Amino acid sequence: MYLVDTNVLSEARRGRSEARNWLRSVDPTTIYLSVVTLGEIMKGIALRLRTDAPAAAALTEWLERLRHDYRERILPISDLVALEWGRLAAERPRGMADALIAATAVVHQKIVVTRNTSDFADTRIPVINPWNL
């Protein structure tokens, strides 16, 4: 079971073969998203809206498709995830989004799929980089 980081989804949307090929190589029912990923995408949409409304609209449609397609596989920030986030944040400074995704993976026993493996270094979770396969 996999927890896919935002960068993998974004790169697949842009047509990057490494991300697309990896996503196509696994059973789609084993792919999960974090609510943090939805928030990161929404942040990108809000920023894009300031300068390029048509692009923001296209991203909004993509976000809604993701929400629909993964509706049963979007993992929340629960109390257990929050506690694990606190432990990870105390170990070393890292971005809040990455730490929450890492904590979600720990609690739900998922493999993180990301291009940014260094963001998840020194956690006790397995990581796959589709660009290194």
Predicted segments — roles?
Residues 8-9, 37, 81, 100-101, ...:
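Alpha-helix capping/helix-boundary segments
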Residues 35-36, 78, 116, 131:
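Residues at the C-termini of beta-strands that transition into short coil/loop
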Residues 43-48, 57, 68-115:
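Active-site neighborhoods of divalent-metal-dependent phosphate/nucleic-acid chemistry enzymes
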